[in-house]
């Protein structure tokens, strides 16, 4: 009988050959889990030991779910869609994919849900690929400092709280104070840039509606369409009737759509309206998943919820195409309390805030921007030079007016300098009022703020200021090239300023107030001694 010899090399080769040629059957390859609990948009699934965090799972009826909790025996799944058809005992399968959305220029002018599906009845969207919702924000070396202006068309903001491309500027205030109006006006103001056809000027806009009424979203879409702004805007809608999971995901969907354009070297403006409702939706999801609650019952990672979203807004370096994504997150406060949990979180993440006061709104000061506590931390570097030149004195005039106004309420008589200061402050305050959906070009803003801070509105009645404004701008367009010079260069040179002074003075000689009297021309009327006293007070306040 021949002796049996065992060669390890042959055994090893046979095993390698078997392993390399092995193809598992579909049943062996596919993991199947079962629903053990389903309620309130949340499902608990047992099985699926290989499921990943944030992986998409598919239920029997085709509904998708997002794996958020990976416990030892169960997976906590947020149902993405209608959950009434999901019952205990149903099978659940892995998809092997993380949540992503389609992206591309086909989304311009469309209204989509948080999964990227069109809901406007205009057919399918032409896409250019897909982008994962959970993406790392650009690193420090991938960024560039904010240095290009993003004009909102709102005088109070562009002059005193400027925004740059790539900045995160919070809009915060009580309900019904005009937060959405500021964001929509900013989108409308990008139309001239879009119509120019210059890619370096064009700004694509994304409006993310979170927890809003369906009628409100429809009115926003109508306003954009009427103004011709819908062609460069995408609306991601997660109305109040949507499940909490959709409201939680909507901002990330809008961000993914915008990031696609940003990494192509284009400029994007994204509005999150509003992140308070996203935080509430995330709180609801977390409590249903039995995550431990923290302050105000929010989960411990609610700060990370917003920081990882807003850090995606950036100005990219030249090596990455120099694209940008500017973020305008909106936060709703209760009783003007900016020190609450979510407002302070988002204030600490963003590059500045525009605070809207309900008292100012009710006093008909609209937009109701509280200049005192509103700030832009990085926008000053991006501000148009001509605007920066005229806005410095505007801040000083308004600050002095506010302090003097409070004092004047209790004073029986005031000196001439104080009365002149109050008059100018009232004129400037009236000048900064602006109706909704009426953004101003930057050159128009520069001309009017220059006129106000140089005293050319001091003898104009408050009721006549807006008529004076529109007629003056019309006069400057027809008879001078001042506005074109400011628009093309962004500067207010000595020559341009002299031409502007001549244009304003010639117009004042023809402007009649509501009483029918010509207000006159030349230098603004004021007593020389009073001006000296006023200047001395300004110098003293600056030194103090």
Curated annotation (Swiss-Prot):
Membrane topology: Peripheral membrane protein
Recorded superkingdom: Bacteria
GO cellular component: a single term: plasma membrane
CDD domains for the chain: ATP-synt_F1_alpha_C (cd18113), ATP-synt_F1_alpha_N (cd18116), F1-ATPase_alpha_CD (cd01132)
InterPro entries: ATP_synth_asu-like_sf (IPR023366), ATP_synth_asu_C (IPR000793), ATP_synth_asu_C_sf (IPR038376), ATP_synth_F1_a_nt-bd_dom (IPR033732), ATP_synth_F1_asu (IPR005294), ATPase_a/bsu_AS (IPR020003), ATPase_F1/V1/A1_a/bsu_N (IPR004100), ATPase_F1/V1/A1_a/bsu_N_sf (IPR036121)
SUPFAM superfamilies to which the protein is assigned, alphabetical: C-terminal domain of alpha and beta subunits of F1 ATP synthase, N-terminal domain of alpha and beta subunits of F1 ATP synthase, P-loop containing nucleoside triphosphate hydrolases
Site (Required for activity): 374
Main location: membrane
Pfam families (alphabetical): ATP-synt_ab, ATP-synt_ab_C, ATP-synt_ab_N
Subcellular location, record wording: Cell membrane
Function summary: Produces ATP from ADP in the presence of a proton gradient across the membrane. The alpha chain is a regulatory subunit.
Gene this protein is translated from: atpA
Species, as recorded: Beutenbergia cavernae (strain ATCC BAA-8 / DSM 12333 / CCUG 43141 / JCM 11478 / NBRC 16432 / NCIMB 13614 / HKI 0122)
Top-tier EC class: translocase
Protein's name according to its UniProt entry: ATP synthase subunit alpha
Acidic residues: bias regions: 524-535
Family membership: Belongs to the ATPase alpha/beta chains family.
Keyword Cell membrane (UniProt): yes
Keyword Ribonucleoprotein annotated: no
Keywords: ATP synthesis, ATP-binding, Cell membrane, CF(1), Hydrogen ion transport, Ion transport, Membrane, Nucleotide-binding, Translocase, Transport
